[in-house]
Amino acid sequence: MSDTLPLLLRAARGESVERPPVWMMRQAGRYMKIYRDLRDKYPSFRERSENPDLSYEISMQPFEAFQPDGVILFSDILTPLPGMGIDFDIIESKGPQIGDPIRSMEQVKALRPLNPAESMPFVGEVLGRLRKTVGNQAAVLGFVGAPWTLAAYVVEGKSSKNYAVIKAMAFREPELLHTLLNHFAESIANYLRYQIDSGAQVVQMFDSWAGQLSPADYDTFAAPYQKKVVDLVKQTHPDTPFVLYISGSAGVLERMARTGVDIISLDWTVDMAEACARLPEHIGVQGNVDPGLLFGTPDAIQARIDDTVRKARGRRHILNLGHGILPGTPEENGAAFFRSGKSVMDRIGTLA
C-alpha cells in the first residue's frame, strides 16, 4: 500500500526509497515567465495568494512544468496575520509592510486567537484541490512561519537588516516578547493542523530570521516556541512529517534537532556531510544546493546535485535548494535542477 503513496511522503517518513525526492523552495515564483505574466495581470500579492483560483493555479505552475515530487501551497508566512488582527501588505521590491507594528502589551493582549477555517478558508480550499489534482504523483506541502520570524516582522514593521527593534524588545521587555511569541505558537499550531486536515501531507516551518540570533538567544526566543508548535501539532497529527528551515542555521543545527522535528532543511553554508555528522541519525535532512548555482551551467548544477546526494547517502534526504530559488534564475536551469535531481541515481548508483 505504501508504494502507492507519493515518493516525498514515503521519504519524509523514513521509508526506503528509490531516489531522494526533489522540490524547490519558492518553486512557484518570479523566475517562471508564466508566473510573471499572471503577476502583471494581478499585481497584488495578497490577491494572488488569497484568491483560491489564483493560488491554486500558481501552486500548479511548477508541477505542470517540471513535475517536482512536492507541490507546495502558494501563500506567504504572513497570511495568517489578519486572522489575528494584524493587517499587512506585500509591496513588490519592498517586501512585507505591517500597518501598525506591535510594540506594547496592550496590542498583544488585543490579538485574536487564530481560527483558520474562518479567516483563511481559501487555504483549505486550495490544499484540497491540490491533493485531488496531483493524487499520488506528488506530495502536497503546507507551511508556516515560526513564532520568532513572525514576531520579527510584526515588531519591526517590515524586513530589517539588523533587527534592532525586536532585539531591543527581547532584552528590555522580554515578558512582552514572550507573550507575543506564545500567542503566535498556539495560533501557528492551529494553522498547521488546519492545513493537514485540509490536505497537506508534509509541513514545513520557516524560521527565516532565527539565524540572526546568538545560540543562547536562539535557546530563549526561538527554539522553545518552535518546539511548542511541533509538540502541539504532533499531539493531533503524529504521523505528518515536520520540516524546520532556518536561514543561517550552521551555528544551531544541533539545537534545531532538539525541537522534535523530523527533518532539518539545511541552507547552503554548511556542507551536507558535515551536517549529517552533526545531526542525530533519526533526523532527516533537506537541501542544500546553493540557489546561486542555478545561475551557472546545467553541468555545474548536475555535479553539485550528485555531490549533495552522495554526501547524504544513508540518511533520510529530500533534495532541495538551501534557500528559495532566486528571481532572475534562468527558467531552463530550474528545469535542469529537477531533471538532474530525478536522474541522480543513474549517475551515482543506488542509495543502499
UniProtKB/Swiss-Prot annotation:
The keyword Lyase applies. Belongs to the uroporphyrinogen decarboxylase family. It comes from Synechococcus sp. (strain CC9902). It is found in: Cytoplasm. The record marks 76 as: Transition state stabilizer. HAMAP family: URO_D. Homodimer. It catalyses: uroporphyrinogen III + 4 H(+) = coproporphyrinogen III + 4 CO2. Catalyzes the decarboxylation of four acetate groups of uroporphyrinogen-III to yield coproporphyrinogen-III. GO terms for cellular component: cytoplasm. It comes from the Bacteria. GO terms for molecular function: uroporphyrinogen decarboxylase activity. GO terms for biological process: protoporphyrinogen IX biosynthetic process. Keywords: Cytoplasm, Decarboxylase, Lyase, Porphyrin biosynthesis. Pathway: Porphyrin-containing compound metabolism; protoporphyrin-IX biosynthesis; coproporphyrinogen-III from 5-aminolevulinate: step 4/4. Substrate binds at residues 26-30, 76, 153, 208, 323. Its main location: cytoplasm. The gene is hemE. This is Uroporphyrinogen decarboxylase. Its EC number is 4.1.1.37. InterPro entries: UROD/MetE-like_sf, Uroporphyrinogen_deCO2ase_HemE, Uroporphyrinogen_deCOase.
